[in-house]
A protein has these predicted regions:
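Internal "kinase-insert"/substrate-recognition segments embedded within catalytic cores
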Residues: 91-120
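ATP-binding glycine-rich loop module of kinase domains
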Residues: 12-42
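Conserved short submotifs of the Hanks-type protein kinase catalytic core
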Residues: 69-82
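Short beta-strand micro-motifs within the conserved protein kinase catalytic domain, predominantly
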Residues: 60-71
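Helix-rich C-terminal or lid/interface subdomains of diverse kinases
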Residues: 38, 192-257
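An alpha-helical support segment within catalytic cores of ATP-dependent transferases
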Residues: 110-159, 169, 253, 257
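Active-site acidic catalytic loop and adjacent metal/ATP-binding pocket
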Residues: 20-23, 144-188
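The N-lobe alphaC helix and its flanking beta3-alphaC-beta4 segment of protein kinase-like domains
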Residues: 38-54
């Protein structure tokens, strides 16, 4: 049965693999695809509620919805424009925007230790690797061994911080897509961003990494050591066209030995 969700919630603001965002006045409705795990919806609402308490620059969440077989969240509508808008074909503007995002990311990572409400990134990555049926037993064992020896820290990590998840209204920033937020090594957060930018353009990812390391003072190798592990969680979870890149990042574990 088809449903007219635009009539229910308003015009479509954006659409991704897991959810569609609708405008409802000053609110936004994030409506997840049918079959999307119920636990993930409530986890995101829980994370958003805790971020609000810590004055993190993210939308406030108001309720969990269940409409015609699909879960959703009603939250504040992000103000301003997405930082990734109108960057295509303008490399100088792209780099200038990336500079701003790196400064913001480093600032957020230095907010202080995060409470126990946020899962530790090593635990999340361990669970994701263990559940990933696309990894052979040997690869899984190797990546879990690498993960075990990576640093334990307590910084705030968005784990999906890039052009598309930050809005700016000329005064304030708003950060969205908060399900992956963890506490842990800030270098791990940077590794996640590096992979996201690599999906767009490898040169862009390298520019990001150089800028991030220069701003944060974190050595390049500290970021790159997280790549094989994070890439291992993505194998089979991202579009097929990115598989060679994911394989390259996983195989970097051989070079690191």
């Amino acid at each position: 049965m088809s449903h007219d969700f635009e009539a229910m919630f308003g015009q479509v603001l954006g659409q991704g693999a897991q959810a569609t965002i609708y405008a409802q006045g000053e609110y936004a409705i994030k409506l997840y695809r049918e079959g999307y795990p119920k636990g993930n919806v409530f986890s995101e609402a829980y994370i958003m509620a805790n971020l609000e308490r810590e004055n993190f620059p993210s939308p406030k969440v108001y309720e969990v919805l269940f409409v015609n077989g699909r879960y959703g969240l009603r939250m504040d509508r992000a103000k301003g424009k997405m930082m990734g808008e109108n960057l295509a074909g303008n490399p100088e503007k792209t780099k200038a925007t990336l500079d701003v995002l790196v400064d913001l990311q480093c600032h957020l990572q230095k907010r202080g230790n995060v409470g126990d409400w946020a899962p530790h990134i090593k635990l999340r990555l361990r669970n994701d690797l263990t559940r990933n049926a696309m990894l052979s037993a040997g690869r899984k064992e190797k990546l879990l061994g690498i993960l075990e020896n990576l640093p334990d820290k307590e910084a705030l990590c968005h784990c999906d911080f890039h052009f598309g998840n930050v809005f700016f209204d000329g005064t304030e920033y708003t950060i969205i897509d908060l399900l992956q937020i963890c506490r842990g090594d800030p270098a791990a957060d940077a590794a996640c961003s590096y992979v996201s930018y690599s999906f767009i353009q490898r040169e862009l990812a390298e520019y990001y990494l150089n800028r991030y390391c220069g701003t944060s003072g974190i050595p390049r190798e500290d970021v790159l050591q997280w790549l094989p592990v994070y890439a291992g969680t993505l194998l089979g979870q991202v579009p097929e066209k990115f598989k060679p890149l994911i394989e390259e990042f996983i195989n970097a574990a051989q070079v690191m030995e």
